[in-house]
From Swiss-Prot:
It holds the Pfam family Ectoine_synth. Belongs to the ectoine synthase family. Its EC number is 4.2.1.108. It catalyses: (2S)-4-acetamido-2-aminobutanoate = L-ectoine + H2O. CDD domains: cupin_EctC (cd06978). It comes from Sphingopyxis alaskensis (strain DSM 13593 / LMG 18877 / RB2256). This is L-ectoine synthase. Keywords: Lyase. One of its GO terms (biological process) is ectoine biosynthetic process.
Length: 137
């Protein structure tokens, strides 16, 4: 059994911060669960262009508001508490938080914990290609 406390995780190197977001990685590849689980905050006013070419992601919004735009269709969906979106086709998208948005996310395959988005908006497929994260405050 794995039991972890979010407050404790936020004080470790499992708490990764990058432009527009901070992510507490609660479960990682080394935990052997077959997925990773993150509690991520998307910062108000940011525009997060992402394209997970090597991972599938599902996200549940817990707090905050904003929008997500599907770049293939142009559709824009409202984000608010209780809304879930799943990037089941490696969807290119932009998240625009109006307020800080708190989310719970799962990734398959699991991330190692070091990943931050590359220039294409993806996490690298090979963990050895992952850049070192910027420490969170």
């Amino acid at each position: 059994m794995i039991v972890r406390n979010l407050g404790d995780i936020r004080k470790t190197d499992r708490n990764v911060r990058s432009d527009g977001w901070a992510s507490a990685r609660m479960l990682l590849k080394d935990d052997g669960m077959g997925f990773s689980f993150h509690v991520t905050t998307l910062f108000a006013g940011s525009e997060l262009r992402m394209h997970y070419q090597n991972h599938l992601e599902a996200v549940l919004v817990l707090k905050g508001t904003g929008t997500i735009e599907d770049l293939a269709t142009g559709e824009v969906h409202a984000l608010r508490p209780g809304v879930m979106y799943a990037l089941d086709d490696h969807d290119r998208h932009i998240v625009r938080p109006e307020t800080d948005i708190l989310t719970a996310c799962v990734f398959n395959p699991p991330v190692t914990g070091r990943e931050v988005h590359d220039e294409s908006g993806a996490y690298p497929a090979d963990p050895e290609l992952a850049r070192e994260p910027v420490a969170a405050d």
